[in-house]
Swiss-Prot record:
This is Endoribonuclease YbeY. SUPFAM superfamilies: Metalloproteases ('zincins'), catalytic domain (SSF55486). The keyword rRNA processing applies. One of its GO terms (biological process) is rRNA processing.
Length: 156
């Protein structure tokens, strides 16, 4: 399912069972719009089950475990400072894992989905949390975007 609004093109691929919760396409557009504003971008968001996520994590990150989200930058992705940019990368979100995590953390599912989408998108833009300075900068940006969207600080 492709969503194209103004300058953003979002390809959402859902390979999960029908009875599993994941946000409607309008939410992904809203979240990404708050990051990219009027930039021309294309992004793929793939909603997967635990089996596929574990496979992808092992194959590409060399970790034999589950995770909530993976980000894969486009080979020619650059930090967005220019007015236009095309394909920036792929985000893989594990629906059962995120939903379970929301229950454990006593957070609203939609809010955790927003945070995971924002967090992984920032990775596509070269944000990281490898050291304390970059982690602080990334978290500050995540908190700012989440609050702008009317959500709570995801780190509280």
């Amino acid at each position: 399912m492709n969503i194209k609004k103004n300058l953003m093109k979002i390809d959402i691929q859902n390979v999960c069972k029908k009875n599993i919760f994941f946000p409607k396409k309008k939410y992904f557009f809203l979240w990404l719009k708050n990051i990219f504003k009027n930039k021309k971008i294309e992004i793929t968001i793939r909603i997967v089950d635990m089996l596929e996520m574990k496979f992808l994590n092992k194959k590409y990150k060399k970790k034999n475990s589950l995770t909530n989200v993976l980000s894969f930058q486009s080979p020619d992705s650059i930090k967005i400072k220019h007015r236009f940019l095309n394909y920036i990368g792929d985000i893989i979100l594990c629906a059962p894992y995120i939903n379970k995590e929301a229950n454990i953390l006593k957070k609203k599912k939609i809010e955790l989905w927003a945070h995971m989408t924002i967090h992984s998108t920032l990775h596509l833009l070269h944000y990281s949390h490898k050291d304390s300075k970059s982690k602080k900068n990334m978290q500050k940006t995540e908190i700012y975007i989440m609050k702008k969207l009317g959500y709570n600080n995801p780190y509280n």
